[in-house]
Every structure is written in structure tokens, then in C-alpha cells.
Amino acid sequence: MQLPRWWELGDPCAWTGQGRGTRRMSPATTGTFLLTVYSIFSKVHSDRNVYPSAGVLFVHVLEREYFKGEFPPYPKPGEISNDPITFNTNLMGYPDRPGWLRYIQRTPYSDGVLYGSPTAENVGKPTIIEITAYNRRTFETARHNLIINVMSAEDFPLPYQAEFFIKNMNVEEMLASEVLGDFLGAVKNVWQPERLNAINITSALDRGGRVPLPINDLKEGVYVMVGADVPFSSCLREVENPQNQLRCSQEMEPVITCDKKFRTQFYIDWCKISLVDKTKQVSTYQEVIRGEGILPDGGEYKPPSDSLKSRDYYTDFLITLAVPSAVALVLFLILAYIMCCRREGVEKRNMQTPDIQLVHHSAIQKSTKELRDMSKNREIAWPLSTLPVFHPVTGEMIPPLHTDNYDSTNMPLMQTQQNLPHQTQIPQQQTTGKWYP
């Protein structure tokens, strides 16, 4: 790299001393110089190239210690900085990552992980991932580029694939190289293949699983797909026998002879294992027969005329009004016939009614009419109960309780003894002394 002229001689405006013999830079120029050197070397080391294979699990760890060097040193000397750092990853020029690439970071104090399984469509196409690190204490950022060059695999895809569900692991724990290596070693002891690769890892939450409760160190669970070049072993085939299928339908653990080889570190749900044999799958792909690319001749195109004929809506208007009106008229005539022409009449009804019943109803009507007339006229003669009577004791004639001009509408239905002016007083029995006849 060819350095500029001012790099060799320094800033002439910042020289101190007399003459050109003492070329010493000021502190401000020294700081600018170091910052420029820091930026140049950061740019040089900002890009990383990785070469994963198609159909094989790709794991890239975003180490916090690596990105700490991109931020200024901790202000207090002698103290180790442990700033919270988060990462944002996206495909260059796009807001998100490719469909096959996933990212996870549990806390700002843990490393981030990019993982996924590239497909054959990505072979030969460099995929540039922009990685932006955020320092949550100083709010500073640093950006690196990860260039993924997908290489083609010789035996892609592997013909025999098995997917295991591990209940006691989270996805970030399973992505650790030593844990994944231990699992592949256990599978290799059971399967005995010549070639074994991890194809993909998926969290149980991405398959519709529930978030575990924060008790008893419960895990989310993870699906691990592996592929091999030899048929499945007899131990793996034990899951498909009817006895184990029945136990799985009853939510019971199946009996697997090789489970003890995994139980020391991995708790596998054998009811959720999936065995895929690519050699027995019938290809549904149909070859597309391409034609000449020439459309059949449909004749000369004739666009519609510019002058449109006027449409007469008079007939539509008549039909719209005439049909409902005719239906309404017919219904009206039927109703009028039923109400007017089908009545029996009073005379016919009386002829069919017995005489005794007519007399009974006539008396009731006569009494009702008389009571109504009496209620309307309050000036009629008083009943016989209000005429003058003799006093039961003295024999004197007592005038009526009410005069002729008394307003009977305000008269109470019942009167107390105090309201009666001519009430006879009955002597009370003496309680003290002697009584002689």
C-alpha cells in the first residue's frame, strides 16, 4: 500500500521548532494520525470470507470480543469493559437475511450465531452479509461484511436423512461445536455410516412449540437433521414397528435399544423422529416442453367503435314498474274479495244461534248499557238504603246521611265510627266495684 506524502513528512502546518531539522507533530496531529491508521486497518480486517458447502449446516459465531476492538477503550484504566453488544444482520442492499440463513443471540452479553443450510441455488453466488454491532453503553456502531461463498458438494444431497428432536437443548447450545460434535459422534455409533453430516438445526419454537416456563431449567427443544450415505440402522428402524407406534399414540415412550447411547447427554423424543429415504421418493418433476414462443394468429385486431349507440331504457323502466304493480294489484283484489265478499253477515249469524243464547246475551248487553248510563248521570234518585229510617232505641226518625245536593263522587266507600253523626253509643262494662241488677 502506497502511503501519501504527508504520511512520510507529517503535517507541515503542525511542525514545531525552527527549520526543517526538527520535525515533531503536535498532540492534535498525533491523535488524527492514529485515528487514520486505526480506520485503515479496521477497513482492511472488516471483511471475512467463508466457504460452506451446499446441503451442510453452516455456523458462524459473532464473537463479542472480536467487535470490542472496534469501539474506543474503556474510560477507566485497569478495568475490563463488558459492554452489552447486540448485532443486526442483513443481506447487502436488503433489509433482511436470505431465507436459508437464521440468526440468534440470547442476551446482549452472549455471542450471536448465524446458522443455516445453503441450497444448491446459492452455489457460485457470493452472499454478502452486513453485520452491524451496537454498543448499548456508548451507542456506537461497527460494521463488518461476511462474504459467504457456497461451494458445491460431491454427494449432495445425502440419500438418507434422519431428523431428531432433542428435548433438553436450546438452539444456541446445540450450535456449539463441541456439543454438535458429541451428538454426531453418538449418531455415528448407532448408524455406522461412512459419511455423516449435519444438514440443518431448527428451534422447536419455529415449529410451533411453546416457550417453556422458567422453572426446573426447562429447554425449548431443537430439531437436528443429519444425513448419511448408508441405509438406516436397525436401531433407528425400531421406531417404525407397530408396538412403538402404539406407545407413541398413547403418549408413552417407545422402547429403543440404542437410546442409552444418547441418554447420557441428549434426551431424544423418539416419537418425533423422522426418517427420509431419498432413494425411494418418486420425482414429481415434469419436464417443461417449450414451444416456439409464437402466439397463434387470431386475426386482425378490431378495436371498439368510438361512437357508441344510445340505448333506450323505456322498456326497462316499464318492466321494472309494471310487474311489481300488477302483482300488488292482484294481491289487493284477493284481499278485498276475502274481506268483503266472504262475510257471513249478522242475520245469518243470528239465524244459526239458539234463542236462549240470544236472550242471555241481550240481557247482559241491557244491564251493561244501564250501568253505563247510570255512571254518566249522578243526579238520579238515592237508593232505598239512604231513605229516612227510625232510630232503633228512641224510635225517632233520623234524617238521611246525605242531602240531595251532596256530592257522592267524593264519598268514601267505608266510614269509621267517628265519621257517623248518629252512631248509637253502647255503654261500657265497669271493671271496678260491684254491680247489682
Curated annotation (Swiss-Prot):
Pfam families: Sarcoglycan_2, Sarcoglycan_2_C
Topological domain spans for side Cytoplasmic: 339-437
Extracellular-facing ranges: 1-317
Membrane topology (UniProt): Single-pass membrane protein
Major location (coarse): membrane
Transmembrane regions: 318-338
Organism domain of life: Eukaryota
Residue positions with a glycan: 200
GO cellular component entries: cytoskeleton; dendrite membrane; Golgi apparatus; plasma membrane; sarcoglycan complex; sarcolemma
Post-translational modification summary for this protein: N-glycosylated. Ubiquitinated, leading to its degradation by the proteasome.
Keyword list, A-Z: Cell membrane, Cell projection, Cytoplasm, Cytoskeleton, Glycoprotein, Golgi apparatus, Membrane, Transmembrane, Transmembrane helix, Ubl conjugation
Keyword Ubl conjugation attached: yes
Keyword Coiled coil: no
Subcellular location: Cell membrane, Sarcolemma; Cytoplasm, Cytoskeleton; Cell projection, Dendrite; Golgi apparatus
Family note: Belongs to the sarcoglycan alpha/epsilon family.
Function statement: Component of the sarcoglycan complex, a subcomplex of the dystrophin-glycoprotein complex which forms a link between the F-actin cytoskeleton and the extracellular matrix.
Identification of the protein by name: Epsilon-sarcoglycan
